Regions:
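Short beta-strand segments
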Residues: 9, 75-78, 152-155, 231-233, ...
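Catalytic phosphate/nucleotide-handling subdomain of diverse soluble enzymes
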Residues: 220, 227, 234-258
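N-terminal glycine/serine-rich phosphate-binding loop of ATP-dependent small-molecule kinases
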Residues: 1-94, 105, 121, 147, ...
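A charged helix-plus-loop insertion that forms the helical arch/lid used to bind
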Residues: 90-102, 174-178
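Gly/Ser/Thr-rich active-site cleft segment
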Residues: 10-12, 120-236
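Glycine-rich phosphate/pyrophosphate-binding beta-alpha loops
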Residues: 12-15, 78-82, 104, 175, ...
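Short alpha-helix plus adjacent loop in nuclease-associated cores
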Residues: 96, 100-114
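Residue-level signal for inorganic ion chemistry
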Residues: 49, 74, 100, 139, ...
Length: 258
């Protein structure tokens, strides 16, 4: 029996839609769409054209359905740490890019509230100046966070736009620097120490969860209907999941960010 899946992999410099055809114990892949990606400068900050990215997501799905009328499911992964704030279901723009230097001024202040050594003990996440924890703290200082009633990492936002269902995927959430390595949920002690509103950080969902179907409007636009699945939405996590390796084996990760 043949099964067909659509993987949408979006990096900091390009995105691609790859159809996987599983048949007779083998997997064949077919890249059906590719688009350039990159940061833009707006009002002195580096941002993502998140609406433009979403339009490319839909264009690629349409290209996939044109070639493969039946697709069993699709999912999206992207780079980590960046996110979209929402109000009443709509994005509060801009969507800042991790390369923007807005976090530099708040890093020391974050560590005054919770020293990095303690953060590392609780989360296991190495220090990077672009980690979401510093971005969110800066958004709190400027008042943007208080305007929001929801918070989604970039791939979960794109999936939400496709199917209308919000989810907070575990592997990508760990890149925020806010997830407890012990409980595998957002750490309330860190949130309280930084005065980040806990209402924005509900329970996490594990990869492999079926979110639903494409919304009727999206299905009409792309020319087909399929299940929308929550993959390991951090692109590195999805890449590692595909490596045929033993437990506790080392791997090397390098991308545009490095």
């Amino acid at each position: 029996m043949q099964r067909i899946f659509l993987a949408i992999d979006i990096g900091a410099s390009s995105g691609r839609h790859i159809v996987g055809i599983e048949a007779d114990g083998a997997l064949q892949t077919d890249e059906v769409y590719r688009f350039p990606n990159g940061v833009q400068r707006e009002n002195g900050h580096l941002i993502w054209d998140i609406e433009g990215i979403f339009q490319h997501v839909k264009a690629g799905i349409k290209a996939a359905f044109a070639k493969y009328p039946h697709i069993d499911s699709l999912s999206i992964d992207t780079w980590a740490v960046d996110y979209v704030l929402l109000k009443d279901g709509a994005a509060l723009l801009p969507c800042h890019a991790y390369r923007d230097e807005r976090t530099q001024a708040v890093i020391d202040e974050v560590h005054q509230h919770m020293p990095f050594a303690k953060l590392y003990r609780r989360t296991g996440i190495q220090f990077q100046p672009f980690n979401s924890i510093y971005q969110l703290y800066e958004d709190a200082k400027t008042g943007r966070l208080q305007q929001a009633d929801d918070f989604l990492m970039v791939p979960e936002y794109l999936l939400y736009r496709l199917c209308g269902v919000k989810a907070r995927e575990y592997t990508n959430a760990t890149s925020t620097g806010l997830v407890s390595a012990a409980t595998k949920e957002y750490d309330p002690e860190i949130l309280r120490a930084l005065s980040l509103p806990e209402r924005l950080f509900p329970r996490l969902t594990q990869p492999g969860t079926v979110l639903g179907q494409l919304t009727p409007d999206v299905a009409r636009e792309v020319g087909g209907q399929t299940s929308v699945v929550l993959c390991a939405t951090h692109d590195t996590a999805s890449a590692v999941e595909g490596i045929p390796m033993a437990e506790n084996a080392p791997f090397l990760s390098s991308g545009t960010w490095s």
